[in-house]
Amino acid sequence: MATLLHIDSSVFPSAASASRAVAETFRTAWQEQHPDGTVIYRDLSANPVPHITADAHTAGFADPATHTPGQAAAFAEREKLIAELEQADAVLIGAPMYNYAIPSTLKAWLDNVILMGRTAANENSKVTGTPVTVIASRGGSYAPGTPREPYEYVQNYLKAVLSDALGLELEFIVPELTMAAHNPAMSELVPLAEASRAKAHEDAAAKAKELADRFAA
């Protein structure tokens, strides 16, 4: 049975979070195709993973037999997160834009799972080629040609780490202009925001079914 690793990082509940809501659409469509499959779920806002410490970092480059008690404890946490990623047939990540970047909790998760010689810089990595769908929501628009394009650090960063470093098969779904309904200065953009959100839900369902069919074959 196929395994989906689902990561949420928004600080808001689904009713107030585009990334969570669209990710739910993806997950629901996936589970309809794989009712007996496994979903590994991590809510990084409710249960943050540890930030990388010196012990966690150095343990990744040392023989486990030589680990200090501090290194062993810190690396055990990394090992758990890496094992979940290696187990996944597909990955789903909710990545809202906060102050032009990803939430710090998501950065902490990435710092834990990127391990040189295992998940990165390893031609035999178990995660290479794993499809990852990122719901990259944002309050405005940072699309090519817009005034804020130079401030788009979410997709650019995640491409570097997920695709270039980890070798995952990356696709973005981008619900944008999510603040239009709450900011009077953006009121004229509400129709565009609604269209963007509707398309994001449609794309999420379609992508989930596409991947589910791939692993059912």
Swiss-Prot record:
Keywords: Flavoprotein, FMN, NAD, Oxidoreductase. Transmembrane segments: none annotated. Pfam families: Flavodoxin_2. GO terms for molecular function: electron transfer activity; FMN binding; oxidoreductase activity, acting on NAD(P)H as acceptor; oxidoreductase activity, acting on NAD(P)H, quinone or similar compound as acceptor. Its cofactor is FMN. It is an enzyme of class 1 (oxidoreductase). Binds 1 FMN per subunit. The keyword ATP-binding does not apply. Its EC number is 1.6.5.-, 1.7.1.17. It catalyses: 2 a quinone + NADH + H(+) = 2 a 1,4-benzosemiquinone + NAD(+); N,N-dimethyl-1,4-phenylenediamine + anthranilate + 2 NAD(+) = 2-(4-dimethylaminophenyl)diazenylbenzoate + 2 NADH + 2 H(+). It comes from the Bacteria. The keyword Transcription regulation does not apply. FMN binds at S10, S17, A18, S19, S137, R138, G139, G140. Quinone reductase that provides resistance to thiol-specific stress caused by electrophilic quinones. Also exhibits azoreductase activity. Catalyzes the reductive cleavage of the azo bond in aromatic azo compounds to the corresponding amines. Belongs to the azoreductase type 1 family. Homodimer. PANTHER family: FMN-DEPENDENT NADH-AZOREDUCTASE 1, FMN-DEPENDENT NADH:QUINONE OXIDOREDUCTASE. This is FMN-dependent NADH:quinone oxidoreductase.
